[in-house]
Amino acid sequence: MNVDLVVAGSGFFGLTVAERCAAGLGLRVLVLDRRGHIGGNAYSEAEPETGIEVHRYGAHLFHTSNRRVWDYANRFTAFTGYRHRVYSTYKGRVYSMPINLGTICEYFGRVFAPDEARALIAAQAAEVRAPANLEEQAISLIGRPLYEAFIRGYTAKQWQTDPRDLPAEIITRLPVRYTFDNRYFNDTYEGLPVDGYTAWLERMADHPRIEVRLKTDFLDLRDDLVGNVPVVYTGPLDEYFGHSEGELGWRTLDFEMEVLPTGDFQGTPVMNYADEDVPYTRIHEFRHFHPEREHYPADKTVIMREYSRAAARGDEPYYPVNTPADRARLLAYRELAGREDGVLFGGRLGTYQYLDMHMAIASALSMVDNRLRPHFAGAARPNNRPGGSGGPSPRPRPRGGADE
């Protein structure tokens, strides 16, 4: 095979590695993806009836405070001035998220000064001193009233489990802002790609030394590749090793898309549904991500209802569950990965951690700098093959959205 590096997966991690190795190191790179499109879960496409850009795998919002990542992304796309804001419905009323001073005033029906709100939440949170489950942990952070309104039902739908039966460690913090700032992210840089995610990702792959093969499963070719050419693998870690140490637990998402005969369904890009008797967790309305696009129809809109559940084998894995059993399996898989000659493991699936897009790019740049560049610079030396898991990873964290 006349290539210097094989990358399994064409998401942000894989394409960043491929682009940097091709453009920065002069390598011939083959990118393989089992799907029929480029871009992993960031893939977007125009809904055919309306032309509205839809994020097929749930809303993806780009944000970062990493200047290097921002500068790198801007090589391939310009960004809009979009700033993400989220609202939640509960018992027929709408509140801004994450919980902020406006949310507190709206929910309790009076005006609070910041110090008054802090004192109120502290008093309500004092109900629980030694949390033994997720419900008690959440109450110890924000108090029972706000927990019952915005966390309990939403969490039960996410995990398909009563929060009293979930471990406390799932939630380590619940941000509360004692200002009226209702921006979802606090990063220095934020926006959406002007031409969409797929155009951005295609530009990353558009290099004469990069070949992309879609509908091609790396695992079908593994025996021919591993040991003969260096590999960066971004697929599921447990699947690479044939689930020999057991399956790593994931949550998955199901989506229900609908074209509606109205120019505006909900007035905002994302609406959470905190009531437990509403089966979906949130609704996306994609036209609101790009209000600057004048070609969107005035009489039609596209919505996507999102449902959360435990992933079974064959489902698309989104969020690591990260139980104690999962962490034990992960350690075993990391040991196997460290002994895998000529293979580096990276990305969300390859390291069993939740990665926002900017985190995936940063991690890929680090792999190129610290593993691949030194390897190929010293490729003439014997026994100098990249291998292993790429170093320890931060603990996965559960999140409420596809890529926030």
Annotate each language-model stretch with its function.
Residues E49-Q124:
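Dinucleotide-binding Rossmann-like beta1-alpha1 core, especially the glycine-rich loop
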Residues G24, T216-G338:
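Mid-domain catalytic core of redox enzymes
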Residues A46, H284-G391, R395-R399, D403-E404:
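Conserved flavin/dinucleotide-binding core of flavoenzymes
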